[in-house]
Amino acid sequence: MALLNRDDWYDIARDVDWTLSYVDRAVAFPEEWKGEKDICGTAWDDWDEPFRVSFREYVMVQRDKEASVGAIREAMVRAKAYEKLDDGHKATSHLHMGTITMVEHMAVTMQSRFVRFAPSARWRSLGAFGMLDETRHTQLDLRFSHDLLNDSPSFDWSQRAFHTDEWAVLATRNLFDDIMLNADCVEAALATSLTLEHGFTNIQFVALASDAMEAGDVNFSNLLSSIQTDEARHAQLGFPTLDVMMKHDPKRAQQILDVAFWRSYRIFQAVTGVSMDYYTPVAKRQMSFKEFMLEWIVKHHERILRDYGLQKPWYWDTFEKTLDHGHHALHIGTWFWRPTLFWDPNGGVSREERRWLNQKYPNWEESWGVLWDEIISNINAGNIEKTLPETLPMLCNVTNLPIGSHWDRFHLKPEQLVYKGRLYTFDSDVSKWIFELDPERYAGHTNVVDRFIGGQIQPMTIEGVLNWMGLTPEVMGKDVFNYRWAGDYAENRIAAE
């Protein structure tokens, strides 16, 4: 008997829905999970996915992708290819696996909520594929990290990180807890699927895959590319959701996108910007973080806003100016507080690297070069202790990132407000605005510095903080090249003398 064409039965299978008689629909689909608010239920009949796939087709495609990833993985592991890679590039894979692996696992929960609570039967059906995608991504990352555990204990943090209170992990976890797990289905689709996955994930996977291939890390590059093909598909779920929202509640859609864009951007400054402009070997860099942002994010997001009749975020001019600086601030901050990291950062300011940075960022020297000059001077004088922290940085109560890290060193003034007797500090007026939109959403959270001042961390020393974060000597961050890049300047000075 011949198989029916997919189009003959697809709509029937996709649109299967519950006919409730023993329970009220509002109980089966609580508003706090569904998130449709004042949009009537029939409006979601217009929700129509931009791709069509049957389970049979899905399995066939995923099987082929798994076979490809597995074959390359086995070949690279047998060839011990990882051992031959540049140490700076290795920091990228440590950072990525530690901050992203459990995010993929969190996304399984988000997609499962789509399956159960989304206001459209079509959306619920397609959420099943997203749930399978994210399960696959989690397992791929864990398998990659497990293969390389003997090469570096930092890979243990692919699973361990989100069970610790390491400060970078807290910042990442706080964002994804908020937009994936705390958000209702509608907000999660716009904030995660549309803004994060369809936009910023392109940087994390496309850009890093390209840089990894240039660096000779075929295994990591292939892994990222395989995951990105899934992300590109299920990230499309945000568009039909936005279609419905623009017809019935465009103001809410605008606000969700504006908040999600800024929060996602700040985290990706730390995760992707630092990796692209400092950890990737300079000869292997395809483009700068700013260039990639302008090409893939700015044009992309502007096009979405324009096509759907939305406005640019009110902070867009500030955002564009920070492209020249924010990730440089986060890099010098993470390098300085390197003992608080679970990976070994690269200073990334040898003479050759510095020429590249000045070429890509004409104002880099004025804002950051002078600070690195002081660090280099201390290193070459043997005063390593002066390049290490004695206390903690002030952190933003929304992004959980250091104050002064969103722009250049001439824009360090924190924003502050008092809410219910507690003083809150923010890295920018944008983060303060986000807090003021929904104070109760953020007011209960305490960052590392809040907990330190509150006496939750004992003893109240750097050593006490490191122990509280779960950092052990074998993974505690140190300069990945043992400061060899600083020798560039010492040798030239001696030669001149």
UniProtKB/Swiss-Prot annotation:
Catalytic activity: propene + NADH + O2 + H(+) = 1,2-epoxypropane + NAD(+) + H2O
Record: residues binding Fe cation 2: E134, E197, E231, H234
Residues that hold Fe cation 1 according to the record: E104, E134, H137, E231
Subcellular location per the Swiss-Prot or TrEMBL entry: Cytoplasm
Gene Ontology CC entries for this record: cytoplasm
Keyword Oxidoreductase listed: yes
Regions crossing the membrane: none
Family: Belongs to the TmoA/XamoA family.
Record-given protein name: Alkene monooxygenase system, oxygenase component subunit alpha
Species lineage: Bacteria, Pseudomonadati, Pseudomonadota, Alphaproteobacteria, Hyphomicrobiales
